[in-house]
């Protein structure tokens, strides 16, 4: 069976369009073409390996379909992201690149599955007990690699994990003896093996869910930590696990990181790499499952939800990817909400100056539903700036902005950082923004793959943006 490739998905050679309706149609057609290709590929895998456990490809395909539905429903809010004001047209190259990030994740899971099965040294027969056993064993090995670990875990969870492994091995030994002693049909062998796998997988995951739920609750430890004069943020061996109540997944895996005060930090990485989770943990939007997270002297893993909220109110400004504006308040009132979170009036940044800087002064009486996605993003940015917090975090803060406004906003980022000595940390897919950063963090597969410190960060006008 051939490997899958992005190049096999048909897309137009057209690079841009000035027609909004045509842009929407091209996007819709490409999304449908992509889903059809991925759906057909998944069916081929299931047909070719019908007796295999096609776990990751199936999971990634479902994730893509859900993302596509959400993207299609909110497509209008993304217009500014792909519109090049200077040339007055929509960039199809930017559109395809954005969609392809999601497609490539699914294709990678398909090809990884193919590659793994091509290496299996078993002959193709209608049913091979040895092959099926190997696959089931490999699946348990993969589950155990993803098991939740922490020195904080109560002994009962560790004991239960050991007991389940011993039980699984004991039941498998009994199953093999039964098959050896009795002349069972291939169908009966397959049923017995599937029952063994499903039963033990269910018990394993049930225990993992309990572990993750415990790890994601606040710890009973000293909340204050020694403040580092140089590093405002320090992470040591940080893990983050998530669960939907049925399965679990490690999103961050053993992250170590130190961030200096007053730096501008850019976090890069592919979709699903864990970069937004990392941002949420260091900003107090979420708690780590294990490890040490010290932010401005606070031991974040020990703070309950109420104390995390107080921490954010006191120290943090956050620019959300989906804007997070209050729908019944005007542009100005939304920004005032941010300013009023700063208890020291002398530290607040002028709302009038911010409105002018982000080009929203003439729209300050408008409600969010009267604004485009890019305009709402500008309000979200101004709201975070108005508070003049110690730390500013942004999840794709320029993602909905056109090229011209992106440059204006980034200049504001750097100006506020310089004037108020603010520490700024943003997640972005735009690699060019990394040229402005003091430190660039590249995240992949839940780990920090590289750290790069720019000794001479560039200014916005020094970057070739097109």
Curated annotation (Swiss-Prot):
Ranges of residues in domain ABC transporter: 233-463
Highest taxon in the source lineage: Bacteria
One example GO MF annotation: ATP hydrolysis activity
Isomerase keyword on record: no
SUPFAM superfamilies: P-loop containing nucleoside triphosphate hydrolases (SSF52540)
Pfam families per record: ABC_tran
SMART domains per UniProt: AAA
Keywords tagged on the record: ATP-binding, Nucleotide-binding, Transport
Binding site for ATP: 269-276
Listed InterPro entries: AAA+_ATPase, ABC_transporter-like_ATP-bd, ABC_transporter-like_CS, MacB-like_ATP-bd, P-loop_NTPase
Family according to the record: Belongs to the ABC transporter superfamily.
Protein name (database record): Putative ABC transporter ATP-binding protein MG065
Biological source species: Mycoplasma genitalium (strain ATCC 33530 / DSM 19775 / NCTC 10195 / G37) (Mycoplasmoides genitalium)
Highest classification ranks of the organism: Bacteria, Bacillati, Mycoplasmatota, Mycoplasmoidales, Mycoplasmoidaceae
């Amino acid at each position: 069976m051939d490997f899958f490739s992005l190049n096999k998905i048909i897309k137009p050679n057209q690079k841009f369009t000035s027609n909004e309706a045509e842009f929407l149609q091209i996007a819709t057609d490409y999304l449908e073409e992509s889903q059809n290709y991925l759906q057909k590929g998944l069916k081929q895998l299931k047909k070719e390996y019908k007796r295999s456990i096609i776990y990751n490809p199936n999971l990634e395909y479902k994730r893509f379909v859900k993302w596509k539905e959400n993207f299609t429903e909110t497509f209008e809010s993304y217009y500014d992201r792909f519109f090049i004001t200077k040339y007055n047209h929509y960039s199809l190259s930017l559109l395809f690149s954005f969609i392809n990030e999601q497609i490539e994740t699914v294709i990678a899971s398909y090809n990884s599955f193919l590659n793994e099965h091509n290496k299996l040294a078993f002959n193709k027969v209608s049913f091979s007990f040895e092959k099926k056993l190997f696959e089931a064993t490999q699946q348990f090995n993969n589950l155990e690699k993803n098991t939740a670990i922490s020195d904080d875990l109560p002994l009962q969870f560790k004991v239960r994990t050991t007991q389940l492994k011993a039980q699984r091995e004991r039941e498998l030994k009994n199953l093999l003896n039964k098959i050896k002693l009795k002349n069972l049909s291939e169908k009966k062998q397959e049923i017995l093996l599937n029952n063994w796998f499903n039963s033990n997988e269910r018990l394993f995951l049930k225990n993992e869910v309990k572990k993750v739920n415990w790890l994601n609750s606040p710890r009973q430890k000293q909340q204050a930590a020694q403040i580092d004069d140089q590093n405002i943020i320090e992470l040591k061996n940080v893990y983050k696990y998530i669960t939907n109540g049925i399965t679990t997944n490690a999103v961050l895996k053993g992250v170590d990181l130190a961030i200096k005060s007053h730096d501008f930090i850019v976090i890069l990485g592919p979709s699903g790499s864990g970069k937004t989770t990392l941002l949420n943990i260091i900003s107090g939007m979420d708690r780590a499952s294990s490890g040490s997270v010290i932010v401005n002297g606070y031991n974040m893993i020990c703070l309950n939800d109420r104390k995390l909220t107080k921490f954010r109110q006191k120290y943090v400004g956050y620019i959300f990817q989906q804007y997070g504006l209050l729908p019944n308040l005007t542009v100005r009132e939304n920004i005032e909400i941010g300013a009023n979170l700063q208890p020291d009036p002398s530290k607040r940044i002028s709302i009038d100056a911010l409105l002018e800087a982000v080009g929203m002064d003439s729209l300050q009486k408008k409600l969010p539903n009267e604004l485009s996605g890019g305009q709402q993003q500008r309000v979200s940015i101004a709201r975070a700036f108005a508070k003049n917090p110690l730390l500013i975090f942004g999840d794709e803060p320029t993602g909905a902005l056109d090229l011209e406004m992106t440059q204006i906003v980034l200049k504001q980022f750097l100006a506020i950082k310089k004037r108020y000595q603010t520490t700024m940390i943003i997640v972005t897919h735009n690699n060019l923004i990394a040229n402005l950063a003091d430190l660039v963090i590249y995240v992949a597969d839940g780990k920090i793959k590289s750290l790069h410190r720019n000794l001479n960060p560039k200014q916005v006008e020094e970057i070739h943006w097109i």
